[in-house]
Amino acid sequence: MFKSGFVAILGRPNVGKSTFLNHVMGQKIAVMSDKAQTTRNKIMGIYTTETEQIVFIDTPGIHKPKTALGDFMVESAYSTLREVETVLFMVPADEKRGKGDDMIIERLKAARIPVILVINKIDKVHPDQLLEQIDDFRSQMDFKEIVPISALQGNNVETLVQLLKDNLEEGFQYFPEDQITDHPERFLVSEMVREKVLHLTQQEVPHSVAVVVDSMKRDEVTDKVHIRVTIMVERDSQKGIIIGKQGAMLKKIGKLARRDIELMLGDKVYLETWVKVKKNWRDKKLDLADFGYNQKEY
């Protein structure tokens, strides 16, 4: 008997949702950064064994939006509640419950689907603090289970995956066993470039960046995959930061991104990077759609 199901990973920004998904999948399919609001699109991670398939949906961190991009991200996250049988509500062990958590809890109560509370980053707290956190959240909602984990170190992750397997119902294999995500390679390439920008820049710059893959094709002569990407920013000053002194920052972004892209594609890559200014793109629906943030996602 084959069993399958869809599982949403929900929570505030920067609680470790993408780290968890990448750990379960055994490879990077979601961007990771210590900066909030790193994930902007819903990303599917397809975990398949001989007898089960769990389709995880990693969602953007739920926050109070300040831009049209923020609205897109939050609606994209909440829309997954209509698509799944189970929700993993992830919270950090090293932060007390806040207004953002309470807002999510109210939406989860209204959705009326089983919710597993996942308390992440347990490696950062004393067991007594963890027990307090468990008691506090338990008083807010009737969770199906409460599972403390460390997504970074892998503690208890297998236990959580096994719990999900045990609760699966008989169903179809929705995706082939060798498919690990629903996003095309172009999307993953753009995310890998954006991840390097997130790691290497500060303040407002990371949030003002979109990455568009202009072309991606194999060069018959060199047998390399030739990829051209454009990094979009909102201001000239941000363009200067990303290019860096004598182009040093842009070279660094390209070099680090190329390594990850080559690992993913299993091919040699020639990566060409450009930077363009598109003023206030985060508040323009046409620009959002052009850069891959499309309302069709929800």
UniProtKB/Swiss-Prot annotation:
Residues 120-123 are annotated as: G4. It is a peripheral membrane protein. The keyword Lipid biosynthesis does not apply. CDD domains: Era, KH-II_Era. InterPro entries: G_ERA_dom, GTP-bd, GTPase_Era-like, KH_dom-like_a/b, KH_dom_type_2, KH_sf_prok-type, P-loop_NTPase, Small_GTP-bd. Residues 11-18 are annotated as: G1. Keywords: Cell membrane, Cytoplasm, GTP-binding, Membrane, Nucleotide-binding, Ribosome biogenesis, RNA-binding, rRNA-binding. It comes from the Bacteria. Residues 58-61 are annotated as: G3. Residues 3-170 form the Era-type G domain. Residues 37-41 are annotated as: G2. Residues 201-279 form the KH type-2 domain. It is found in: Cytoplasm; Cell membrane. GO terms for cellular component: cytosol; plasma membrane. Residues 149-151 are annotated as: G5. The keyword rRNA-binding applies. PANTHER family: GTPASE ERA, GTPASE ERA, MITOCHONDRIAL. Monomer. An essential GTPase that binds both GDP and GTP, with rapid nucleotide exchange. Plays a role in 16S rRNA processing and 30S ribosomal subunit biogenesis and possibly also in cell cycle regulation and energy metabolism. This is GTPase Era. It comes from Streptococcus equi subsp. equi (strain 4047). The gene is era.
